[in-house]
A protein has these predicted regions:
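A conserved structural/catalytic subdomain of Rossmann-like adenosyl-cofactor enzymes
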Residues: 2-4, 328-331, 335-567
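Conserved S-adenosyl-L-methionine
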Residues: 233-352, 357-359, 364-373, 386, ...
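Short glycine/serine/threonine-biased micro-segments
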Residues: 8, 230, 270-272, 294, ...
Length: 567
């Protein structure tokens, strides 16, 4: 599928969502919409594995295809006709049965062993009745059993799957909510409409894993745009994610040598819907690199579930990622609380977009927490440095961390000044990047990116003032590929550009009391033109003489005409 088609699929699904949600809160409708898209992915992926597993035994009667693989004719954006994979082949035939349901009916004695085998191979099982194709058939026929079937299907996938990444995956999807309708039949009818429209919209497009993943990501972005301040809880705009991923995928000690071949592990400790982690993965794979393990932590249960779905929808195997539902500040994940320093998890790359100036309640014991012991505990009024120190603690000695923070961390006093000073004296702050205002859905304030390393080589800090480099949009300002590329290239080669970037020695920073306010070091103001006073004076004298000469000549003419002279 072309990039244009992928974008059009996302827009089609968004238009469906915008039309169908009615008075329902966008965040609530988002969870239903994305869960159904995810069920479509699970079904397609599972049926493909089933077909491979059963081989010649897979029912191939005419009209019976896996849900989502029938060919339909559609019109592409350029007006040409094309064949597309359609989910409306979701049923095997007119009776609504899928090929898998036919096999189950013909081989009842083999079902248990077959499902055991599928759990071992794909780590989850979807019963025929719960496949997307069967669900769409119920929706299109306005079957009263749809809601009940969905509830049972979600529960089965969660409880009967082999991998822990499926546990509680649909826990926040309340199919019995009054928001869908007061009575069962109203809720069932609403779900029939939603699912039928999703199936209709997707029928026009080929929907492989990458396409579904991109559509999912597009919808997350659109819902984020409509969520205002809440968007910051689960979504980092792609333009900002691209900067962070571009930085951490370069060689950590010698960025100018280019991209790394492998990241053994990458961490985002406030991962939201996972868009930032997936951006890092995309950066690595597009250049032929690999990632060993993707690790994330998310406090919000709904967003945590969105993240796990997002990973799977982008083709990340459940063995390749681990997302934990928990609180980063209290560090309640046993995996990260390893008491033996030799066994402490460490990451090649750490990326994060934590909540800005988050109020927290650090207890007295926090001063002894290994994450904060060397630098200090962030104040209650702003946990920014607590998040930063958490990430730095788990960074490998040769790793690189890129974190988005408000500008206050660069100059605020008190305990934050002491933490900042210690980080600078220890040589951990490598680069400070100032971004334009109004890039986020959740806030209009300008933010910065801090790049940190445990063993950085240059005895200076690179400042990049990109605050004026943007395209003004109606709601949010935008960074073009050129803007993003310039930031990454400047970091990579530590380039110095007038009114844009500068390498500042530690002595100068120390002389400024370790204040990192970007405008102190890189001003975007146009320099005033120097005036040569002697030359200017000579020019004015010459002009004055010219005026006097012209006036004298003019007065001669006036005298001949009998008129009074000019003064």
């Amino acid at each position: 599928m072309t990039d244009l088609d992928q974008k059009q699929l996302g827009k089609t699904l968004w238009n469906i969502a915008d039309t169908l949600r009615g008075a329902m809160n966008a965040d609530d409708f988002r969870d239903y919409m994305l869960s159904f898209l995810f069920l479509r992915y699970l079904s397609d992926n599972y049926e493909a594995a089933v077909k491979k597993e059963l081989g010649a035994d897979f029912p191939a009667a005419e009209g019976r295809e896996p849900s989502g693989t029938a060919e339909v004719s559609s019109t592409s954006p350029d007006g040409s006709r094309r064949a597309a994979k359609s989910p409306s082949a979701q049923a095997g035939g007119d009776d609504g049965r899928t090929s898998l349901s036919v096999w189950y009916a013909d081989n009842p004695g083999d079902v248990a062993a077959f499902e055991k085998q599928m759990r071992r191979k794909v780590h989850y099982v979807v019963k025929p009745d719960y496949l997307w194709g069967s669900i769409v058939y119920l929706a299109k026929s306005q079957d009263g059993k749809l809601l009940d079937t969905l509830q049972k299907g979600f529960k089965f996938i969660e409880e009967e799957s082999f991998s822990s990444n499926f546990q509680g995956l649909f826990s926040e999807i309340n199919l019995g909510s009054d928001k869908l309708g007061r009575r069962y039949d109203e809720r069932n009818a609403k779900l029939c409409s939603i699912i039928s429209e999703i199936a209709r919209g997707m029928a026009l497009f080929s929907t492989d894993v990458d396409t579904l993943g991109d559509a999912y990501e597009y919808l997350i972005g659109q819902f984020a745009a409509g969520s205002g301040k809440k968007a910051g809880e689960f979504y980092t705009p792609q333009q900002i994610s691209s900067i962070l991923s571009g930085i951490v995928t370069l060689d950590s000690q010698e960025p100018k040598t280019g991209k790394r071949k492998k990241l053994n592990a990458v961490l985002d400790f406030t991962c939201g819907s996972g868009s930032l982690l997936l951006n890092v993965r995309h950066r690595m794979t597009e250049s032929g690199g690999t990632i060993g393990k993707i690790v994330g932590m998310e406090k919000n249960i709904t967003t945590y579930n969105l993240c796990r779905m997002n990973m799977l929808l982008h083709g990340v195997k459940d063995t390749e990622f681990e997302i934990y539902h928990g609180d980063t500040l209290t560090n309640d994940w046993d995996y990260l609380r390893e008491p033996n320093p030799a066994k402490k998890p460490a990451f090649d790359a750490v990326v994060a977009n934590p909540p800005f100036s988050y109020r927290w309640e650090p207890g007295e014991a926090m001063s002894e927490d290994m994450r904060f012991k060397a630098h200090g505990v962030a104040p209650k009024s702003a946990a920014d440095f607590a998040f930063l120190l958490h990430g730095l603690h788990y960074l490998k000695d040769d790793g690189v961390m890129a974190i988005i923070l408000p500008h206050g961390v660069l100059f605020r006093g008190g305990v934050e000044e002491r933490i900042r000073t210690k980080l600078l004296q220890d040589g951990h702050i490598d680069t400070v990047i100032g971004l334009p205002a109004n890039l986020f859905y959740s806030t209009g304030i300008p933010v910065c990116i801090l790049v940190l390393k445990k063993c950085k080589k240059p005895d200076d800090v690179l400042f990049i003032n990109a605050a004026e480099q943007f395209v003004k949009g109606k709601r949010q300002n935008q960074l073009t590929d050129e803007h993003i590329g310039r930031i990454i290239e400047t970091y990579q080669y530590r380039k110095q550009h007038e009114r844009y970037s500068r390498r500042v020695k530690m002595k100068e920073i120390e002389a400024n009391d370790f204040n990192l306010n970007i405008s102190r070091y890189v001003s975007t103001a146009e320099a005033e033109e120097e005036i040569d006073l002697a030359a200017t004076h000579a020019e004015l004298v010459a002009i004055e003489k010219s005026i006097q000469k012209a006036t004298a000549k003019h007065n001669e003419f006036l005298k001949e005409l009998g008129l009074p002279p000019l003064p």
